[in-house]
Amino acid sequence: MSKKRLYEIAKELGKESKEVVARAKELGLDVKSHSSSVEEAVAAKIAASFKPAAAPKVEAKPAAPKVSAEKKAEKSEPAKPAVAKEEAKPAEPVAPKTEKVAAKPQSRNFKAEREARAKEQAERRKQNKGNNRDQQQNGNRQKNDGRNGGKQGQSNRDNRRFNDQAKKQQGQQKRRNERRQQEDKRSNQAAPRIDFKARAAALKAEQNAEYARSSEERFKQYQAAKEALAQANKRKEPEEIFEEAAKLAEQAQQVQAVVEVVPEKKEPAVDTRRKKQARPDKNRDDYDHEEDGPRKQQKNRSSQNQVRNQKNSNWNNNKKNKKGNNKNNRNQTPKPVTERKFHELPTEFEYTDGMTVAEIAKRIKREPAEIVKKLFMMGVMATQNQSLDGETIELLMVDYGIEAKQKVEVDNADIERFFVEDGYLNEDELVERPPVVTIMGHVDHGKTTLLDTLRNSRVATGEAGGITQHIGAYQIVENGKKITFLDTPGHAAFTSMRARGASVTDITILVVAADDGVMPQTIEAINHSKAANVPIIVAINKIDKPGANPERVIGELAEHGVMSTAWGGDSEFVEISAKFNQNIEELLETVLLVAEIQELKADPTVRAIGTVIEARLDKGKGAVATLLVQQGTLNVQDPIVVGNTFGRVRAMTNDLGRRVKVAGPSTPVSITGLNEAPMAGDHFAVYEDEKSARAAGEERAKRALMKQRQATQRVSLENLFDTLKAGELKSVNVIIKADVQGSVEALSASLQKIDVEGVKVTIVHSAVGAINESDVTLAEASNAFIVGFNVRPTPQARQQAEADDVEIRLHSIIYKVIEEMEEAMKGMLDPEFEEKVIGEAVIRETFKVSKVGTIGGFMVINGKVARDSKVRVIRDGVVIYDGELASLKHYKDDVKEVTNGREGGLMIDGYNDIKMDDVIEAYVMEEIKR
């Protein structure tokens, strides 16, 4: 038989454990505490002892009338609620009603219960206040004992503290038991629970019945039609059977459509969720909130244990649910593996060089491992992240049976494609454009004077030294038609500028002086024009001079491939005088005639492209570039890429210095708004938005930097000797600052071409703009001097140069810069000396003097012997000694030299083995000018 503990019996009876233990001892049971266990029979005996003897079973009485909560509260005492209930029981029953009333569960009066609990808590607080007062008095006694007593007082205090704690714990346990009893009573009086499963089953059955009723009629119609068809099939032909079957099928579809359109009526769903009931407040008094010490620690430990137990239970549940722990599912069949869908191969595959195996696999919907296997069979070892070249990709696609096509990628940063292809032009929008004419020729042959005459301005007077320093672009109007002129320098240093002018021009006017004829730069201009396939118009200038000979010029040009139309060639010759405005109109008419033959056209509707004629850095405006529009129309605020830089057209001025907003084809304009000054000769293109222009410009700058790094020379076995030899050369470091980019290029090229043996020119830095402080700092660090061409240093840069002793040389004529640089380079060389024999003498007699040495008497037979000259001793045609004279005398006098035919005496420094008939050769070392 099972056993029960006494505290379990007390809990069932709603009594305290002390009362149950005392009653068990009264019944003669050997129990020690509430944890003692007894048999079930003994437990029943103990429980029976608590039941009142005078409580016989009473027959069922009629239902007592409801008593109001206020009356119950008046009858009940706050200190002992249980006794109050017992006293309320013997109330006389009310006469039963004649009507039979169904028994209803009596509802709880929560308000009355809360008021009873409040009164009970108030009584308990009064008792606790008295206990606290007693405890305070005991504490004061303990303090007095502690002051007066010694060890005995300390032990008494400990005992009293222990007793107080024990009493406190007993009181807490008592209140806990009372709360449990009240909760048990409330749980016994709770309303019966709702069976949700039964309700759900009933609802489902009702829904099924409704569905059966709605579909019964359709089923009967279908069954009747089926039976009628079966009867008709017995006596009809097959053709009629098929026709009727088709009709019935149509009818069935119509019925089904009607059923689908008309929704079935559904009863509103019954809310079967359990309503949230009001839970009574826990019977806790304010004394529990004021507790601290062991009581509070015990509560914390119990809450921690609850959390720990919950975690352990969750861990155990998860462990049970893990794969393999469920023994009942071991023999179950595994779930079927879903088959992968088969994707058909594409018919075409567009690829780019450098595609990886993984990218190809994704495009053709195949596994990378399959492609790696195919490549291995083809003899190509590759991984899925490895890039493949175009040839390998094509072979792979052939193996799969796919047509491979290489994707043509348009490089957004490549603006050169606009100058090679013209597919972007609209043929319907092409219009005639002005011709671009370049004036070329030798220096001082009258190019700028001719252009000055054409423009009716005095440009030539502003040029230093009478030569043009950089390209100028101008536009004039002749007979209602515009002509754009480019003026190129004629000096030898500006070869690259003439080449750029020929590349953007349509017609070349070759100016040749009638008195000078063909010169080196004339031949160079002819070669540039022929290389650019540009027609040449020869303007024989200065025919007003007395020594002019145009026929000689025509003959010299014919020797270089420029034939006159009069001689059967294709070049027009016009004799002019730019100074006196002679035959200028004829020259312009010839230009328009040649332009008409060429049929020059452009599309002004597309975005503008063109070439940089010149670029410079302005102190107030920043980077300024002179552009020649070749196709399209350039507008203000257009996003533009120029060479390796980009920007937006902030302002635009024409050749007259006036602001314009639009520039059509063959129009030269100066723009501002670029990030940096571009290089002369760079191409430009307008983009659709600033974002794409910025991306293209940054990409072009990045490529230019990479190209520059790749061009860096490396030391190899072939050039090792040249590198070592170059290290022995002396170097002249130069920083070049000029007004325009063309002058910078010309200066750099000219200085590097200076050929002085043993010295080389190193261009440390070259840029456009004024000389600033950073240039001076760089010159000081690199031991260089600064050459300023048509620019001046800032005041701060000048002060810093004086303080740091940096040399700044300012020039406005290029050939003077070259001459000055040659002198500086020659001055850096070590002096070079040449040996020069000044005389010969023969030893006639020797004299040995003690403590002095050997003195040789000689006679000069050729030239002279000087005191500061060097001498060689030659014996039998062999040089015995080479040294210097220690003394030279004529008789007894010291002399500076002994001339031809005279006699004298000499003594050689450090040499005494002089003999008769020795030849003394006197010579000096003279410096050679380079």
From Swiss-Prot:
Coiled-coil intervals: none
Gene label: infB
Region span, G4: 541-544
Region named G5: 577-579
Binding, GTP: 441-448, 487-491, 541-544
UniProt feature, compositional bias: Basic and acidic residues: 68-90, 110-125, 157-167, 262-295, 337-346
Record-given protein name: Translation initiation factor IF-2
UniProt feature, compositional bias: Low complexity: 50-67, 129-141, 309-318
Domain tr-type G stretches: 432-599
InterPro entries: EF-G-like_DII, IF2_II, IF2_N, P-loop_NTPase, Small_GTP-bd, T_Tr_GTP-bd_dom, TF_IF2_bacterial-like, TIF_IF2
Region (G2): 466-470
Keyword RNA-binding: no
Subcellular localization, as worded in the UniProt entry: Cytoplasm
Classification via CDD domains: IF2_eIF5B (cd01887), IF2_mtIF2_II (cd03702), mtIF2_IVc (cd03692)
PROSITE patterns per the UniProt record, alphabetical: G_TR_2 (PS51722), IF2 (PS01176)
Keywords: Cytoplasm, GTP-binding, Initiation factor, Nucleotide-binding, Protein biosynthesis
Molecular function via GO: GTP binding; GTPase activity; translation initiation factor activity
